[in-house]
Amino acid sequence: MSQIKLIVGLANPGTKYEDTRHNAGEWLINEIARQFNVSLKEEAKFFGKVAKINAAGGEVRLLVPTTFMNLSGKAVGALANFYRIKPEEILVAHDELDLPPGVAKIKQGGGHGGHNGLKDIIASLGNSNNFYRVRIGIGHPGSKELVAGYVLGKPSPQDQEKINAAVDEAGRCVDLLLKDGITKATNRLNAFKA
């Protein structure tokens, strides 16, 4: 596996959205920033909030785009081009409808599953979907028509507790991934259930 050089947390900007399900990716970046004791700072040229951490294999950038979700690729593309980071050196954390709250999984590649943030990132990386993902389960509202409102809604207190537990575990697994590689981290996170 390539060394991960960029970890992205997908979100919509502004306080109106910070507690919504669609911002679960940002919750993970905040957890990693806490672990490494760094603060994200707004960087206009990368259309996002950025921090740098030093992990076992070298420098890793953290990024939360401050564009809206469907323009996330603008931020990822700008930072990846500037630092010459390849798709397989990128880990994207995002909310996942197909996993229940309390579960998170690591995987490489795959489609966007209708997730507009992933769709835009794939396009911005020259149609490459070869990056890694941390899929943070938020559950599914049951019907396609309800999805748009659901992802922009706040989880129930019980679901939030489970999502927080999965985000905490994902944070520990990202640390493991940076130290020991993808396999150990994937096996550990994929077995977790809050």
From Swiss-Prot:
Record PROSITE patterns: PEPT_TRNA_HYDROL_1 (PS01195), PEPT_TRNA_HYDROL_2 (PS01196)
GO-annotated molecular function: peptidyl-tRNA hydrolase activity; tRNA binding
Residues annotated as signal peptide: none
Site (Discriminates between blocked and unblocked aminoacyl-tRNA): 12
S-S bonds: none
Keywords annotated in UniProt: Cytoplasm, Hydrolase, RNA-binding, tRNA-binding
Classification via NCBIfam families: pth
Family: Belongs to the PTH family.
Protein name (record): Peptidyl-tRNA hydrolase
Protein's organism: Actinobacillus pleuropneumoniae serotype 5b (strain L20)
